[in-house]
C-alpha cells in the first residue's frame, strides 16, 4: 500500500505540473464530442449520406484511438524517465506501427465492452426475477431495488478491473509489441483484478469521476439569460477536465506501477 500511495503522489505531482497538457487534452476531447454529436444528427435520406456517416464514424474512431495512444505513450514515457511533468512532444511519441497496434487494441476493446454492456443489461433486466427467487428461497421479502444495487456494485468492480486491464494491455502493447504482451496477459489480468492497479482505477473513478458527475448534474439557481449558459459551459468544461484528469491519473499510475524508471548507463 505504501508503494501505491507513493505512485499516486507522483501521478498527482506530474499532473499538477502539466496544466497546459490537461487543458489541451480536454479541448481535444471536447472537439471529438462535438464531432460525435454532429454525426448523430446526420440524416439517413440517401446512400451518399450513409457513406458519409460511415467515413465520419471511422474518422472519429481513429481520432479516439490516437487520443488513447497519446496518453498511454506520454504516461509510459514520463514513468520510465522518472519525469516531473508531461512534455507536449511525448503525446506524439508513438510510431505508425504503434498506432496500428493501438487500432487493433481499440477494435478488440470495443467488442469486449459491448459484450459486457449487453450482459450487464441482461442481468439488470432479470433483477426482479432474482429478487423473486431469493424471496421464495429465504421466505423473506427481498427488494429488486436492493438486488439492483448489488448488481451495480459487482458491475462497477468488473468495469474498473476490466478498464485497468485494457489500459495496462495498451501500455504493454505500445512499448513491447504483441508477442511479449500476449505472454504477460495473465499476469496483467491478475494485477488489475486486485492490487495497486485496481485501487488506482477505483480512486480515479471514485474521486475524479464522482466530482465530474456532481458538476455535470449540478443545477444552480440562476436568472435566465447569458449567465445561465455561461455557468453551464463552465460546469461542463470543468467536468470534462476532471474526466480527462482521471483518465490521465489512472494511466500514469498504471505506467508507474508497471514500468520501472530506466536506469542511466554506468561507465
PLM-predicted stretches and their roles:
Residues 1-267:
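Hydrophobic alpha-helical membrane segments
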